[in-house]
């Protein structure tokens, strides 16, 4: 029966809530098909809280179940398990919330959601998108960090604040996008391509806080994964908590366990860098001090030698040796000069003995014709020729009165 109301006579909230509760209560117990997500078992309580997700639509229903019923399920319930539950919808009037009170749970097969993701994971792995050799190293100090995250989200604060705490001068280009729902993937892909085309962006971080399996589905979407694989800029995945592992973690160049962990990976710690510089300075000073000490030891060793204890004595000894060598050199040179002089005199004497003048001194003569040519035989002159006779001392001009051939030579006396 419809409630009667008007602007002048509105229905109180409590009445509306009560009527909703009555309508919901009329549904009675029903079997519901869905996937288990966001399971919460609180210690010390007998109630298990979880969500039932429609496998074909983005619709979720809060459900509760007695702990003993939940723990009797075989196989052990996990995120994404496809089940059929017997429950009664109840509307909690004080909070105005709807939940399904479950009395029985029956698994109807492995969760389609996880199975689909597993199939996609195998396909991408076979294509080599997870290969370690595809992973690019992060820059030591990026000029600009591209950050893709929800607008004003905790993930944004975690990355920005922790990164600036480590390196205050770090710059960010933040792209605010939807991080769940039907618009998440296209917005993330568009932001990714814009940042990848920016030449000053040296690394891109995709960050989101924790959530249910269905909340994190965009980060296992094939379109997004292939866009990340095609990026030229290194990409860091920082999705959820440490236990969350979307497929983006396998494709990204670096998989950070949390947004805070991503901040630690993308920039160095300025305090650590100062400490390393100080350590390097200490090592350099120690190395120089060690080198100086070693050279000082070498110098002290050299100074301790006797030759350096009294260096003048060695110089004097060397000087005396040089003087001795000079004297020996002079003596040897004088001896060599005297021997050379004697040899020269002997050679001069021999040359003089062999010279024509010496031969003439011994009584020989040289006969020349008027032209100065030497007459060597009687057949070179005729009777009446005038000749010049060169003696050891002086010359004679003579006239040939007789010519005798060699075979009929007459004694000198007969010529006269």
From Swiss-Prot:
InterPro entries xrefs: Exonuc_VII_L (IPR003753), Exonuc_VII_lsu_C (IPR020579), OB-fold_nuc-bd_dom (IPR025824)
Keyword Cytoplasm listed: yes
Gene Ontology terms: biological process: DNA catabolic process
One Gene Ontology CC term in the entry: exodeoxyribonuclease VII complex
GO terms of molecular function: exodeoxyribonuclease VII activity; nucleic acid binding
Any Pfam family the entry gives: Exonuc_VII_L
Protein name: Exodeoxyribonuclease 7 large subunit
């Amino acid at each position: 029966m419809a409630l009667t109301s008007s602007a002048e006579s509105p229905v109180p909230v409590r009445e509306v809530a009560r009527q909703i509760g009555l309508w919901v209560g009329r549904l009675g117990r029903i079997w519901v098909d869905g996937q288990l997500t966001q399971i919460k078992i609180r210690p010390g309580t007998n109630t298990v809280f979880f969500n039932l997700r429609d496998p074909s639509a983005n619709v979720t229903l809060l459900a509760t179940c007695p702990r003993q019923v939940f723990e009797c399920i075989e196989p052990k319930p996990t995120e994404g398990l496809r089940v059929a539950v017997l429950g009664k919808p109840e509307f909690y009037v004080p909070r105005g919330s709807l939940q399904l009170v479950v009395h029985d749970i029956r698994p109807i097969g492995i969760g389609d959601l996880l199975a689909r993701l597993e199939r996609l994971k195998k396909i991408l792995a076979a294509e080599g998108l997870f290969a370690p050799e595809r992973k690019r190293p992060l820059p030591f100090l990026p000029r600009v960090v591209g950050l893709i995250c929800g607008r004003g989200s905790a993930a944004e604060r975690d990355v920005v604040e922790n990164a600036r705490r480590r390196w205050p001068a770090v710059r960010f280009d933040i792209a605010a996008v939807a991080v769940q729902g039907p618009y998440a993937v296209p917005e993330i892909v568009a932001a990714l391509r814009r940042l990848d085309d920016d030449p000053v962006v040296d690394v891109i971080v995709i960050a989101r806080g924790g959530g249910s399996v269905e909340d994190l589905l965009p980060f296992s979407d094939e379109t997004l994964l292939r866009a990340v694989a095609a990026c030229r800029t290194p990409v860091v995945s920082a999705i959820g908590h440490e236990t969350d592992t979307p497929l983006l973690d396998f494709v990204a160049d670096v998989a950070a366990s949390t947004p805070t962990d991503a901040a630690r990976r993308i920039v160095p710690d300025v305090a650590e860098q100062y400490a390393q510089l100080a350590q390097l300075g200490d090592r350099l000073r120690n190395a120089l001090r060690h080198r100086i000490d070693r050279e000082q030891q070498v110098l002290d060793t050299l100074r301790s030698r006797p030759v350096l204890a009294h260096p003048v004595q060695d110089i004097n000894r060397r000087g005396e040796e040089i003087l001795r060598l000079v004297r020996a050199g002079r003596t040897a040179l004088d001896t060599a000069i005297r021997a050379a002089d004697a040899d020269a005199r002997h050679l001069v004497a021999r040359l003089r003995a062999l010279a024509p003048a010496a031969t003439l001194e011994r009584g020989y003569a040289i006969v020349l014709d008027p032209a100065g040519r030497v007459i060597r035989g009687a057949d070179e002159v005729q009777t009446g020729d005038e000749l010049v006779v060169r003696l050891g001392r002086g010359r004679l001009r003579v006239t040939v009165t007789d010519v005798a051939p060699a075979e009929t030579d007459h004694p000198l006396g007969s010529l006269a």
